[in-house]
A protein has these predicted regions:
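Secondary-structure transition/capping motifs at alpha-helix termini
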Residues: 45-48, 52, 145-148
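Structural recognition of the beta-strand scaffold that forms the well-ordered cores
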Residues: 13-18, 53-58, 95-99, 125
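Conserved SGNH/GDSL esterase-like catalytic core that processes O-acyl groups on lipids
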Residues: 1-36, 125
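Catalytic His-Asp segment of secreted/periplasmic serine-dependent ester chemistry enzymes
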Residues: 61-159
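Alpha-helical scaffolding within the catalytic cores
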Residues: 1-7, 36-44, 82, 108
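Short, catalytically relevant binding-site loops at active-site mouths
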Residues: 22-24, 60-63
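Catalytic cores of peptidoglycan-degrading enzymes
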Residues: 46, 53-56, 65-67
Length: 159
């Protein structure tokens, strides 16, 4: 509630909501619970920021431990969290940036991020460079989307 009041107090034009990494980290990940959490938060924010535009982002991929002391393996629940978010956004006509597939999807997202040294040691959180890259990728996607809008909407043509 306090975080929502803080967001509302900013009177934002755009609210970016990133879900999935924490939700998919638990072994008992539930798509239904994930949907309910997104719906609840979005509903609360829309009450206080009815004119804001909302942009969801999918998780980029992360690792989990394989057993108590096991090696880290790619989190198998991330792809389910991504699908849940993509379906949620599509069913509600919400904007969503699919970082998971932008950075390589099921086969390569984690490998690309690891090879670039963008994960911290826990293989969940990013390094400073990783967060900078995430921001740059999102910025690029927003600019491309805006340019596409300008080309197709403002002149009255549809490409």
């Amino acid at each position: 509630p306090e975080n929502i009041r803080q967001v509302v107090g900013l009177n934002p034009d755009l609210v970016i909501l990133s879900f999935g990494t924490n939700e998919a980290h638990g072994r008992r990940y539930s798509p239904a619970e994930h949907l309910a959490q997104m719906d609840n938060l979005l509903g609360e924010l829309k009450k206080g920021c009815p004119k804001a535009v909302y942009l969801f982002t999918t998780p980029p991929g992360a690792y989990v431990r394989n057993g108590r002391r096991g090696a880290r393996v790619i989190n198998p629940r991330t792809k389910l969290a991504v699908k849940t978010e993509l379906d949620y956004a599509a069913s509600r006509k919400l904007a969503i940036w699919d970082m998971y597939h932008v950075v390589g999807g099921e086969r390569y997202a984690c490998l690309n991020w690891s090879n670039g040294n963008y994960f911290q040691r826990d293989k969940i959180h990013f390094t400073q460079e990783g967060y900078i890259l995430q921001g740059l990728l999102l910025h690029e996607a927003i600019i491309k989307s805006y340019n596409n809008y300008v080309e197709t909407q403002l002149d009255g043509t549809w490409n």
